[in-house]
Swiss-Prot record:
InterPro entries (alphabetical): UPF0145_dom_sf, UPF0145_YbjQ-like
Homology family: Belongs to the UPF0145 family.
A Pfam family assignment: YbjQ_1
The species this protein was found in: Listeria grayi (Listeria murrayi)
Superkingdom to which the source organism belongs: Bacteria
NCBIfam families assigned to the protein according to its UniProt record, in alphabetical order: PRK01119.1
PANTHER family documented for this protein: UPF0145 PROTEIN YBJQ
Entry-linked SUPFAM superfamilies: YbjQ-like (SSF117782)
Protein's recorded name: UPF0145 protein
Length: 106
């Protein structure tokens, strides 16, 4: 499955547009990671725990979107957009949503 943020794929011709496809993941943020991130934030470092959580959530959302495109008979997704949102009363949830246009290319 070709997945790109571009509206076209160089060297490929789009022969059919299927529909817009989405992938969403909502994950809780671990309390221990919060404590570690707070300490690193205080001292000016990066939070590896949060970064790993973000990477995993993004990859899962993209995989979900690709599975939905494949179910439509698409072999590529163009114009992919990735959005992040912090949710919950205490900002304890992370939502990653991705969208793109499922297409068939030669």
């Amino acid at each position: 499955m070709i997945t790109t943020t571009s509206p076209t794929i160089e060297g490929k011709q789009i022969i059919e547009y299927k529909k817009i496809v989405f992938g969403e993941v909502i994950t809780g943020i671990n309390v221990l990671k919060d404590i570690g991130a707070g300490i690193r934030n205080f001292f000016g470092g990066r939070s590896g725990g949060y970064e790993e959580e973000l990477i995993q959530a993004r990859e899962a959302a993209i995989e979900e979107m690709e599975n939905r495109a494949e179910a439509l008979g698409a072999n590529a997704i163009i114009a992919v957009d990735v959005d992040y949102e912090v949710l919950g009363a205490d900002n304890g949830m992370l939502m990653v949503s991705v969208s793109g246009t499922a297409v068939v290319v030669e």
